[in-house]
Amino acid sequence: MDRDYTYRIIGCIYEVYNQLGPGLLESIYEKAMIKELRMNGFEVRSQVEVPVYYKGELICPDLRLDLIVDDKIILELKSVTDFRSVFEKQLYTYLRLMNCELGYVVNFNTENIRESIYPVVNNKFIKSKGFMIKGNSASSAPDSFKSNAEHKILKSQNP
């Protein structure tokens, strides 16, 4: 994943946060993110159906993710006071089911947006691209999130 590409997406997150601040409903941030991402040249789909199959049969047609950017990066938006690890697990499941490499859980209800953007990487892509799992390397993550990304990668390997 191109580092400049992910920086541009994160820049859109910062812009929405700087304009709106914390404390609004998730749906408001979602609409603002769609507008900001499109203004920056991204293709964005919202409330995308995530089909779940079991033994070849569709068993859950109504699971939905918040945003998918250029059919590559999933953004799961939150506006909560109590961030829970289940949000990262939820995003990881979306990444796996949609066959995407990278996603971010973003909690807009914070005083520091930089500390509230959580990268999640699909293990399938880590292995196929030769990422080091135990060598403290997460080369696709932006530098400002590298330690957070490394933690998430290592954590996702040991559920």
Regions found by a protein language model. Name each.
Residues 1, 125-159:
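Intrinsic disorder/low-complexity segments
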Residues 1-20:
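Interdomain/boundary linker segments immediately adjacent to catalytic/signaling cores
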Residues 78-126, 135:
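Nucleic-acid nuclease catalytic cores
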Residues 25, 30-72, 111-124, 132-139, ...:
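Active-site metal-binding core of divalent-cation-utilizing nuclease and nuclease-like domains
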Residues 21, 65-83, 94:
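Conserved catalytic cores of phosphodiester-cleaving nucleases, focusing on short active-site segments
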